[in-house]
From Swiss-Prot:
This is Tropomyosin, muscle. Belongs to the tropomyosin family. Residues 116-140 are annotated as: Disordered. Keywords: Coiled coil, Repeat. It comes from Trichostrongylus colubriformis. Residues 1-284 form a coiled coil.
């Protein structure tokens, strides 16, 4: 009987210890589950941030593409303006050369006009002195008069050419000034776009770094989840084992309690039989 009681007490203690271990395992499972939920929540937050970062990255790439396109368009316009300026410079050079030639022709015509005027004055003087001049003098006067008309025509043509060239030169200078203004405006716009492109590029690099860090954090969280899941599975296995041990011990305790009840009943029956025997012996 004492051995059975000691065994039952030992098994109860073992049962209590098993229950404590099961409770501890359940508490650990609960803690691990809570930690896993927190990690999963952090992972969801990180994924949301990554999604936002990817959206920001896409927008930055679109802004970069738009800025690059604008820059290329402005560079194209500046190249066209520079080509126009170069063409106007060539045209102005040609007009300046033409103006120089016109001035040279005007100078020659003026010299001829002065010479013809001088000859006319000389002829007029001679004509007045020699009223009865010869036919040769008259022919000379006609020649000089023809030279005078030619010189006047040349002078008028030179003046007309000079005015035309001067007018064209003024137009070209105005066109050149406007083209230079457009080229300067285009260059200023290119500087602005290059600065904007630099800012967008820096933002893009920052977003790429943020995305890389977010990916690293996601990998770290996934590794933590795998580790915690493994620990959770291990804890659940230990909890199941502890629960099976408790059930097994409970069955053993129940069996021993049944055996104890049976032994008590036998002890009672034997005691009653002994009492009855003693009473019978006492009657004799």
């Amino acid at each position: 009987m004492d051995a059975i009681k000691k065994k039952m007490q030992a098994m109860k203690i073992e049962k209590d210890n098993a229950l404590d271990r099961a409770d501890a395992a359940e508490e650990k499972v609960r803690q691990i589950t809570e930690k896993l939920e927190r990690v999963e929540e952090e992972l969801r937050d990180t994924q949301k941030k990554m999604m936002q970062t990817e959206n920001d990255l896409d927008k930055a790439q679109e802004d970069l593409a738009a800025a690059t396109s604008q820059l290329e368009e402005k560079e194209k316009k500046v190249q066209e303006a520079e080509a126009e300026v170069a063409a106007l410079n060539r045209r102005m050079t040609l007009l300046e050369e033409e103006l120089e030639r016109a001035e040279e022709r005007l100078k020659i015509a003026t010299e001829k006009l002065e010479e013809a005027t001088h000859n006319v004055d000389e002829s007029e003087r001679v004509r007045k002195v020699m009223e009865n001049g010869s036919f040769q003098d008259e022919e000379r006067a006609n020649t000089i008069e023809a030279q005078l008309k030619e010189a006047q025509m040349l002078a008028e043509e030179a003046d007309r050419k000079y005015d035309e060239v001067a007018r064209k030169l003024a137009m070209v200078e105005a066109d050149l000034e406007r083209a230079e203004e457009r080229a300067e405006a285009g260059e200023n716009k290119i500087v602005e776009l290059e600065e904007e492109l630099r800012v967008v590029g820096n933002n893009l690099k920052s977003l790429e770094v943020s995305e890389e860090k977010a990916l690293q954090r996601e990998d770290s969280y996934e590794e933590q989840i795998r580790t915690i899941s493994s620990r959770l599975k291990e804890a659940e296995t230990r909890a199941e084992f502890a629960e099976r041990s408790v059930q097994k011990l409970q069955k053993e305790v129940d069996r021993l309690e049944d055996e104890l009840v049976h032994e008590k009943e036998r002890y009672k029956a034997i005691s009653e039989e002994l009492d009855s025997t003693f009473q019978e012996l006492s009657g004799y």
